[in-house]
Amino acid sequence: MTNIRKTHPLLKIINTSFVDLPAPSSLSSWWNFGSLLGICLAVQILTGLFLAMHYTSDTATAFNSVTHICRDVNYGWVLRYLHANGASMFFICLYLHVGRGLYYGSYTYSETWNVGIILLFAVMATAFMGYVLPWGQMSFWGATVITNLLSAIPYIGTDLVQWIWGGFSVDKATLTRFFAFHFLLPFIISAMVMVHLLFLHETGSNNPTGIPSDPDMIPFHPYYTFKDILGFLLMLTALSTLVLFSPDLLGDPDNYTPANPLNTPPHIKPEWYFLFAYAILRSIPNKLGGVLALVMSILILAIIPLVHTSKQQSMIFRPLSQCLFWLLVADLLTLTWIGGQPVEHPYIIIGQTASILYFLIILILMPLISTMENHLLKW
């Protein structure tokens, strides 16, 4: 008799996706981050659901409701810090996942890559709106500054900003709608993840060598299920350590002060995972130019498949491209550092240099070096 997992309509889908799926035998730990992102999403949805049961999205009570969760709700502090630091783990895994895609040329699977870019934007939007909800100083001023950027759009900008605010400033209407969208988006993200996996399973997974692995495949279960479980344990250990020993390490102390529209914090900055984009935004002295650079810093990922000039998919056999890749990583770390610094000399010029270098590496140097490597290999 055929196994039920191969005949049952629902189990059949799970079976072909996670059990009998043929996977390349050479996948390294860099291929763990997709499943880690799935766990992050599950943790965020679960902790977020329980937090939403006690949170009130009203300017008068939002800050106090978060305090109430931490002080009075059973294990509320665990939920709150798991959710806040879970977002950081989410972005660490997300950036490593994208970095893996860049290094090993996974962007050649264009549908999977493009859905991934949409997912990245959706997760960033969700995280931004979530940061506004505790209604601390940095929540309020972060929301004011970032939403105000839309006013740089010619002609419709001001109307658009007021439409998003639901008034003439960030206020109760803004907080309520941000809560509604923050609750809704993770479920849309979950649906998009299904689409992401659907497209991935159409082509099959890439592998570290960049060489087609059709002759050498192994079943996903038990090999990669156990490998993924090990990844889960390591990540959840790191998250638990962060939550239980140093929950405020990645947060901003200003957010423990209730929002006050009459008092601007000395340095308005987003959470650490947006600092690289924030540094690019600040490095251009023109509002519209800054906004375009900010959007392009992420949207440039969609252009990468178009500027792939190498005859090889992966960078594993291309040492010059590897040097450029790690230069890009160092550049992004520099931008992250600059984004958290005040706008003064020498940080301004460092930020501007790093921003130019970011676009230069991706749009000009990478394609040039790839073409040069083709000639060196006489291809």
UniProtKB/Swiss-Prot annotation:
<keyword id="KW-0999">Mitochondrion inner membrane</keyword>
<dbReference type="GO" id="GO:0008121">
    <property type="term" value="F:ubiquinol-cytochrome-c reductase activity"/>
</dbReference>
<feature type="binding site" description="axial binding residue">
    <location>
        <position position="83"/>
    </location>
    <ligand>
        <name>heme b b562</name>
    </ligand>
</feature>
<comment type="similarity">
    <text>Belongs to the cytochrome b family.</text>
</comment>
<dbReference type="InterPro" id="IPR048259">
    <property type="entry name" value="Cytochrome_b_N_euk/bac"/>
</dbReference>
<feature type="transmembrane region" description="Helical">
    <location>
        <begin position="226"/>
        <end position="246"/>
    </location>
</feature>
<keyword id="KW-1133">Transmembrane helix</keyword>
<feature type="transmembrane region" description="Helical">
    <location>
        <begin position="320"/>
        <end position="340"/>
    </location>
</feature>
<feature type="transmembrane region" description="Helical">
    <location>
        <begin position="77"/>
        <end position="98"/>
    </location>
</feature>
<protein>
    <recommendedName>
        <fullName>Cytochrome b</fullName>
    </recommendedName>
</protein>
<keyword id="KW-0249">Electron transport</keyword>
<dbReference type="InterPro" id="IPR036150">
    <property type="entry name" value="Cyt_b/b6_C_sf"/>
</dbReference>
<feature type="transmembrane region" description="Helical">
    <location>
        <begin position="288"/>
        <end position="308"/>
    </location>
</feature>
<feature type="binding site">
    <location>
        <position position="201"/>
    </location>
    <ligand>
        <name>a ubiquinone</name>
    </ligand>
</feature>
<feature type="transmembrane region" description="Helical">
    <location>
        <begin position="347"/>
        <end position="367"/>
    </location>
</feature>
<feature type="binding site" description="axial binding residue">
    <location>
        <position position="182"/>
    </location>
    <ligand>
        <name>heme b b562</name>
    </ligand>
</feature>
<dbReference type="Pfam" id="PF00032">
    <property type="entry name" value="Cytochrom_B_C"/>
</dbReference>
<keyword id="KW-0408">Iron</keyword>
<keyword id="KW-0812">Transmembrane</keyword>
<dbReference type="InterPro" id="IPR005798">
    <property type="entry name" value="Cyt_b/b6_C"/>
</dbReference>
<keyword id="KW-0472">Membrane</keyword>
<dbReference type="GO" id="GO:0046872">
    <property type="term" value="F:metal ion binding"/>
</dbReference>
<comment type="function">
    <text>Component of the ubiquinol-cytochrome c reductase complex (complex III or cytochrome b-c1 complex) that is part of the mitochondrial respiratory chain. The b-c1 complex mediates electron transfer from ubiquinol to cytochrome c. Contributes to the generation of a proton gradient across the mitochondrial membrane that is then used for ATP synthesis.</text>
</comment>
<dbReference type="InterPro" id="IPR005797">
    <property type="entry name" value="Cyt_b/b6_N"/>
</dbReference>
<keyword id="KW-0679">Respiratory chain</keyword>
<comment type="subunit">
    <text>The cytochrome bc1 complex contains 11 subunits: 3 respiratory subunits (MT-CYB, CYC1 and UQCRFS1), 2 core proteins (UQCRC1 and UQCRC2) and 6 low-molecular weight proteins (UQCRH/QCR6, UQCRB/QCR7, UQCRQ/QCR8, UQCR10/QCR9, UQCR11/QCR10 and a cleavage product of UQCRFS1). This cytochrome bc1 complex then forms a dimer.</text>
</comment>
<dbReference type="GO" id="GO:0045275">
    <property type="term" value="C:respiratory chain complex III"/>
</dbReference>
<feature type="transmembrane region" description="Helical">
    <location>
        <begin position="178"/>
        <end position="198"/>
    </location>
</feature>
<dbReference type="InterPro" id="IPR027387">
    <property type="entry name" value="Cytb/b6-like_sf"/>
</dbReference>
<keyword id="KW-0496">Mitochondrion</keyword>
<feature type="binding site" description="axial binding residue">
    <location>
        <position position="196"/>
    </location>
    <ligand>
        <name>heme b b566</name>
    </ligand>
</feature>
<dbReference type="InterPro" id="IPR030689">
    <property type="entry name" value="Cytochrome_b"/>
</dbReference>
<feature type="transmembrane region" description="Helical">
    <location>
        <begin position="113"/>
        <end position="133"/>
    </location>
</feature>
<dbReference type="GO" id="GO:0005743">
    <property type="term" value="C:mitochondrial inner membrane"/>
</dbReference>
<keyword id="KW-0830">Ubiquinone</keyword>
<dbReference type="InterPro" id="IPR016174">
    <property type="entry name" value="Di-haem_cyt_TM"/>
</dbReference>
<feature type="transmembrane region" description="Helical">
    <location>
        <begin position="33"/>
        <end position="53"/>
    </location>
</feature>
<dbReference type="Pfam" id="PF00033">
    <property type="entry name" value="Cytochrome_B"/>
</dbReference>
<dbReference type="GO" id="GO:0006122">
    <property type="term" value="P:mitochondrial electron transport, ubiquinol to cytochrome c"/>
</dbReference>
<feature type="binding site" description="axial binding residue">
    <location>
        <position position="97"/>
    </location>
    <ligand>
        <name>heme b b566</name>
    </ligand>
</feature>
<keyword id="KW-0813">Transport</keyword>
<keyword id="KW-0349">Heme</keyword>
